Amino acid sequence: MIDIIKVSNNSELREFVMFPFKLYKGSKYWVPPIIEQEMNSFNKDLNPNLKNADVELYVASKNDEIVGRIAVIVNWYEVKEQKTSKIRFGWFDFIDDFEVSKVLLDKVVESGNKNKLKYMEGPMGFSNLDKVGVLTSGFEIIGTMITAYNHSYYVNHYEKYGLTSEKNFHEKTFMFKDIDTAYYEKMSKIVKTRNKLNEVNFTSTREVMKRTNEMFDLFNRSYAKLSSFVKIIRSKKNLWKKNT
C-alpha cells in the first residue's frame, strides 16, 4: 500500500528535499543540488515566485519508507494574466514502481480539477529559472544545470500514465580545443558595429545592481516566446534585488 503525505513542516520538507540523494546514491551522473537552496525554494520569504503561486508538496511512502515525491504548482500570474489554464508539477522523483508515480501524478490531476484548470505540464518549476524536462537519452552523461537528471525508467512511467512530449530539446557538448573561434569573433565584431554596441564592464556589485531592472526587462523580452515562459514582474525583481 502506498501512503501519500502532504508536507506540512520543515522536518518533512527536508525529507522531501533529501529523497533524491537516496534515489541516486552511487550515480556518477546525477549532480546533487545545494540543500539550502532547495529548502529556500519553498520559503515564501526567500522565493519571490511564491508571492504569485501556490505549491503543495507530497511524498509517497511504502512500508514507512519514502519512495517518491512531487511538487504541485499553480502559478497564478500565468493562469490569470497570461490566460494559460495550466497546473504545473515538478521535483518529481520516484522508484521504479508505477503505483508510486501514478498516485503522485493523481495529486496533480486532483488539484488541477479543484482549481478548474484544463491541463497539466511538467516536470518544471515555478518559472523558466527552475529545472525543467525529462531526460530521454544520454543517461551516461553528467547532468546539466538547467535540466534535471533522471533514471531511464522515468520515460516509461510518463507514457504509461498517458502523458505525451510537448517539446523536445537537444543539448550538445563541445570541447574548446575543437572549436575554431575566428568565425565567431568576426561575426561578433560585425554585430557590434552594425548595432552600435559596446560591452559594459562592472567593477562592483553596486554597479551591477543599478542596471538590474534593465537586465530583467531584457530577459522578459528575449524569452517571451519560449514555451511555458512566465514574465518576471516588479515584485519579483525587487525581492531578488533585496536578497542579493
Tell where the protein language model's regions lie, with residue ranges:
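Feature marks short, surface-exposed loop/turn motifs that line or immediately flank catalytic pockets
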Residues: 76, 126-130, 178
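Membrane-embedded alpha-helical bundles of multi-pass transporters/translocases
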Residues: 19, 51-55, 69
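Extracellular structured ligand-interaction cores
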Residues: 55, 86, 167-171
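Acyl-donor binding region in acyl/amide transferases
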Residues: 81-162
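A short helix-loop-beta-strand connector motif used in the catalytic cores of GNAT acetyltransferases and
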Residues: 43-59, 242-244
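Acyltransferase donor/substrate-recognition loop-hinge adjacent to the catalytic core
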Residues: 2, 148-229
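Conserved beta-strand in the GNAT
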Residues: 59, 65-75
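Short amphipathic alpha-helix that is part of the acyltransferase structural core
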Residues: 1-45, 195-239
